[in-house]
């Protein structure tokens, strides 16, 4: 109990409630939220999340149409101790009606309590219609579908400078082989083809986990990737060691990156700052990296910096995409909860939330029913094109889905030693495998 109280007292918590708008606001409901919702006035659904203001307010604003059209109020509570508090609340009989869960592993943990409930039929139908099987799979536990996806983020991008490419006469590569032909040209011109930095304080090493993940899914596909997360395929498996060799030929090749050891001490946020001036030419990093460039940087297709899709390696793996996101998991079967679940799995919800993000954007959905034109930020359009591709091979960040002792522990430290100390692939793989928690 003292531990629980301790967690609660340091938690930053914000609670907000949607209010019912005047009846006139509900006149266009079929367009605003879609048809077929029950009128359930004076009902309230509680939602618990790690999202805090200002983003929490944007969620509340995006839900106003739903409340106006159904009468169902939504009370959202955000906490920076969400991942610690949710299991405590669920096991203690104080579960929220809906939780926005950021990791598939936490969803599985909640299902194991017996308190999470499978998604209603209409939600399942929406997810089947609008999301790729990969996305649906991450909301599924023990062959039962529980949680519709919420937002999405895109990792499979390579940052570059359109201005520097134009100046040098380079074309954006559209295949893995083309990217390395281009890197060879850059090396011949005495340019640093790839920037790199895996420094991140106590989380140093995480960018290297992303590079390995990008290669594993591209070389060996989603099945091997999933088996790697569960440790059916070990790090010492020939496939994973082959993927590590591919990463080494890419990001540990002095011809392409210069000083390999410097990658271990360069902060990830600083790694690509030389791209606008041509100090280095390409950086594999997620869509959020745009925020690292200083004010005044032209982030556009013909500007100082832009990004292209990191191409596949194995033609049998269709459009590999690594990303992340959150999922709506319910702990109640009350009609008002299911109505909200249904709405949160529609393009109408995604469009409402995108609109509240404003012209700067930054909120993405992998819902294929959302037109790319809904995004006002061109970078969001680029990311959403791949995230919402129903034929893509989508995978979730593997280190986030592995046991924390590995994915946020030994994998970080061992991959850092790989870069900083030249530790062998075999020794790195063995050390990570040996650290895997016993079942």
Regions found by a protein language model. Give the residues of each.
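Secretory targeting and sorting signals
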Residues: 1-24
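Extracytoplasmic/periplasmic substrate-recognition and gating elements
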Residues: 295-361
